[in-house]
């Protein structure tokens, strides 16, 4: 099974590691995969055919190793979805498709980063940018040389990235303490960039985000008329040295103002003062943007003289979003945005394992903006990341209650549908039916909790990372049992309104207070609003 014909030694070696990670190739793989060269294809392109049925066969045409690597993703999808492809041209929309470890909070471990590179490649990404906000080397100790241990770890990341077709980039953020007019501070950051260059890094980041918006040094105040002027001077000076070091180097700048309409004074002046060869990072209208669209990208280009390099703050859930769990699919990113963007980096959560769910959907969008379907992509991400169907069904129910985010989508589609059905039943004089609806959902939720908490659950890391939300999920499940009990004993007045007791009101009030005392966000605000309506109706019956 999985006889690879015509592949290079490098491709053959990678294929062995790929099928070890994806068991479907071992249980239901292809009898033969024929690999051939097609020099007319772009580096990341491939032509892929998969024949399913009793005699599974496949073929890959590619011009480079990268084309072969990404073609495997399509064959994997063909097996997992049982959908054959015929001479399919597999080609990405966005040329730069990246993950940036740029969140506040506990940085990922080295082991997670190494595993992440394989996952990112499975999702179609080709960049990983190391820029953890709370790791001292990134923002606080930037004037000191990087340690040998750190450089060794980055070297390991580069090697693993190369195997997976993912380029590793590194960013430094000196803005908290830098003196922009001091040539020594240009030299200081170049010490690090030279160290990184010596181990193979060619893509760098210079970040000036989340720093004081005024000049802090007397020398800087004397030399520059504005913070923008200081920033552009310093960035251009560093870039001149980086180019001198190696013409293959590139540098991405994250500006002080990294979101807005792109018509603001700082970003327009900064962009126009910046060397046009520098990439300029932008997060959209907001720090965490509900949407990214073509029209805003065009404005950015017109005003700053730079094509935006998007840093999308999703699924990150740091700072004010700590009580949310961002596990939904990416939405609100316009089709065709790649035609007006230098590239796209997704900023994940510190919860490495659960970040992979949304990152998988982002990879799908970046590869094919026209064909991207958020819900289809999300369901596939679960199938890709969790083999056990029973475990997958249980965790799916939990995760579908955690869609609340800056994307402003339905925070809990299935739960809201249940609430709507139950409230319609009691409002139309059928409280017993409403009780049954709520009771059925409650039982399912508590069964989900039992499955996820079992010793046999196949993804214990998912359980650990979602523990806060799982705990509240269980609390809601138990609360629904009490609500079902109330509804089952409610009467119906002659005008079809519910009639209940003062004890019912006390119970509902207690449930709301208990659930609201836990700030963990799950199911949005729908349950609390529904319980408020139920209490109001019972209260009205007691006073009428």
What are these regions (language model features)?
Residues 2-14, 18-21, 46-194, 198-202, ...:
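Feature activates predominantly on carbohydrate-active enzymes
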Residues 23-38:
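Short acidic low-complexity segments
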Residues 371-544:
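C-terminal functional modules
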Residues 39, 175-176, 211-212, 256-261:
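Short, internal active-site loops enriched in acidic
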Residues 102-103, 140, 202, 214-376:
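Catalytic-core regions of glycoside hydrolase
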Residues 135-137, 208-217:
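Short, conserved phosphate-binding/catalytic loop or strand-edge motifs used
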């Amino acid at each position: 099974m999985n006889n690879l014909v015509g592949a290079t030694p490098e491709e053959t070696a990678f294929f062995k590691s790929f099928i070890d990670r994806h068991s479907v190739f071992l249980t239901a793989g292809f009898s033969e995969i024929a690999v051939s060269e097609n020099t007319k294809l772009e580096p990341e392109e491939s032509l892929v055919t998969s024949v399913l049925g009793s005699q599974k066969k496949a073929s890959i045409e590619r011009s480079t190793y990268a084309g072969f690597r990404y073609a495997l993703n399509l064959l994997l999808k063909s097996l997992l979805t049982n959908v054959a492809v015929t001479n399919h041209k597999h080609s990405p929309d966005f040329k730069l498709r990246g993950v940036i470890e740029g969140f506040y909070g506990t940085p990922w471990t080295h082991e997670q980063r190494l595993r992440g590179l394989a996952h990112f490649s499975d999702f179609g990404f080709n960049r990983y940018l190391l820029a953890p906000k709370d790791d001292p080397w990134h923002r606080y100790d930037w004037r000191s040389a990087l340690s040998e241990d750190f450089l060794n770890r980055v070297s390991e990341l580069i090697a693993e990235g190369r195997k997976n077709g993912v380029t590793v980039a590194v960013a430094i953020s000196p803005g908290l303490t830098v003196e922009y007019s001091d040539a020594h501070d240009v030299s200081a950051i170049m010490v690090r960039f030279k160290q990184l260059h010596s181990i193979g890094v060619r893509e760098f980041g210079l970040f000036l985000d989340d720093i004081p918006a005024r000049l802090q040094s007397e020398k800087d105040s004397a030399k520059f008329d504005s913070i923008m002027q200081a920033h552009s001077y310093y960035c251009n000076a560093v870039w001149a040295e980086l180019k001198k070091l190696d013409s293959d180097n590139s540098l991405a700048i994250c500006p002080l103002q990294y979101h807005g309409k792109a018509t603001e004074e700082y970003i327009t002046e900064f962009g126009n003062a910046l060397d046009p060869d520098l990439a300029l990072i932008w997060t959209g209208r907001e720090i965490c943007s509900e949407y990214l669209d073509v029209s805003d990208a065009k404005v950015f280009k017109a005003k700053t003289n730079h094509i935006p390099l998007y840093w999308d703050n999703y699924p990150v859930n740091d700072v004010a979003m700590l009580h949310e769990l961002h596990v939904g699919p990416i939405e609100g990113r316009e089709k065709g945005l790649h035609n007006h963007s230098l590239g796209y980096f997704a900023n994940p959560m510190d919860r490495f394992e659960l970040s992979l769910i949304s990152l998988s959907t982002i990879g799908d969008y970046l590869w094919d903006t026209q064909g991207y379907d958020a819900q289809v992509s999300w369901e596939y991400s679960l199938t890709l990341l969790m083999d056990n169907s029973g475990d997958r069904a249980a965790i799916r129910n939990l995760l579908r209650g955690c869609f609340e985010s800056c994307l402003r989508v339905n925070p809990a589609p299935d739960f809201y549908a249940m609430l709507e059905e139950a409230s319609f039943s009691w409002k139309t004089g059928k409280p017993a039916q409403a009780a049954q609806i709520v009771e059925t959902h409650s039982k399912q939720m508590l069964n989900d909790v039992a499955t996820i908490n079992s010793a046999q659950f196949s993804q214990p890391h998912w359980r650990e990372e979602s523990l806060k939300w799982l705990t509240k999920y269980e609390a809601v499940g138990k609360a629904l049992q009490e609500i079902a009990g109330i509804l089952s004993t409610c009467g119906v007045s002659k005008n079809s309104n519910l009639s209940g007791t003062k004890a019912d009101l006390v119970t509902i009030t207690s449930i709301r207070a208990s659930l609201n005392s836990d700030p963990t966000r799950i199911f949005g605000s729908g349950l609390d609003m529904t319980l408020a309506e139920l209490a109001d109706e019972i209260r009205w019956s007691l006073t009428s």
